[in-house]
Amino acid sequence: MAVLGPKATLAAVFIGPFIVACMLGIGLVYLLQLQVQIFHVKDTIRVTGKPATVSYTTSTPVTPSATTLDGTTYTLIRPTSSYTRVYLGTPRGFDYSTFGPKTLDYVTNLNLILILVVHILLRHCPGI
């Protein structure tokens, strides 16, 4: 067995674990992006599956909002020129109808995103 010099020992003790930690960090960030990307639906994140009515007009809404069937009103973060469609999930696609309940698929609070990310980390990375 060869005797390592002081420079080789320094490299083995500090640089090796640093490279491993960087690779592990990059891998975890990639997995997190992959998990969060599953929830992305054309600039929206599916937070709740509550039936809701989305308010829209032919012009830009003053306060874009969605009201669930129980009367709770959510202000939507991503306003568009008009709300003419609501995403109903992968099997059903977009609902272009103007009548009946819609499914709320817009992020209403940044805290929901943080809770979602923490939930994913705790569920898929229990060692963290």
From Swiss-Prot:
User: Cross-referenced InterPro entries, in alphabetical order?
Assistant: Corona_NS4 (IPR005603)
Where does this protein reside within or beyond the cell?
A: Host membrane
Does this entry carry the keyword ATP-binding?
no
Keywords recorded for this protein, A-Z: Host membrane, Membrane, Transmembrane, Transmembrane helix
Where exactly are the transmembrane stretches of this chain?
12-32
Name the domain of life this protein comes from: Viruses
Tagged with keyword rRNA-binding? no
Tell me what topology the record assigns in the membrane.
Answer: Single-pass membrane protein
List cellular component terms (GO). host cell membrane; membrane
Q: What protein family does this chain belong to? A: Belongs to the coronaviruses ns4/ns4.8 protein family.
Q: What is this protein called?
A: Non-structural protein 4
Q: Which organism is it from?
A: Murine coronavirus (strain A59) (MHV-A59)
